[in-house]
């Protein structure tokens, strides 16, 4: 009898610990804007040392996060014909496929493809980019008719991620019926939902968040305030944007985090880096397991031509975002210090856990 009990206890001790899977109380998420590491079109403009130093100052922050997300502005491919012509101002971005390992080494887990450069080299360029990201285990979404959304598991939590753009080949954020359908599906199937969008007018004079829709180059670039609130009203927990090539306001709405634009992050060539366009914020936030914003940090970085983001001890990106947030979203449920600390102004005590 004793031997039977002993054998039973040994067997129980070796059972898989499925029932005791730890669910994290908090989640750390790192968010950045546009990434275009270099291009071979129309001429070769690539960083020194094969790009190994591009993310030097950002790696530790990106790697320590539970999730690191950004926007891949362009393609990863080694050939093909530009869909925008061959002129010097075509602005088609073709990064060598070998550079994909730099993204994995930097710590990225997810990259949006829903932007106006994903189709620079047509369907072949999109397929090559997807193949490269797949080879590194980096998730992606945002192209219509391809990957609509992804789910990443971290610490017992299922995190759903989707991305929207303003071009015809992307999942369009101006189609709120589409946005609502995708977000609703993720809310039902996952524990926490992150939405990425590429939108808004571009340039140094477009850093303020307007009311209503934005038009740029004759194209509807979306009503981004409405879009972000719509996503959160439908159950999303984190919404982050890019597209204007400058940083914009940060808001906490109904306890959920919104970054309206994180500007340029790693764009050493063919993108203006003058003045505020050179600010490269890396935003690190913490949420609870329900997706509610707890706090965070804007890590101020800056770019110069030919190099990636470098830490900026003057905290210029944080101070720019602080000023924009106070002007454009004064009712935000978060405050930003001059050195970039993000602090929630509301407590969730008493809410159902």
Which functions belong to the PLM regions below?
Residues 4-13:
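Sec-dependent N-terminal signal peptides
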Residues 13-19:
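C-terminal segment of classical bacterial N-terminal signal peptides
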Residues 19-353:
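Acidic, metal/ion-coordinating pockets
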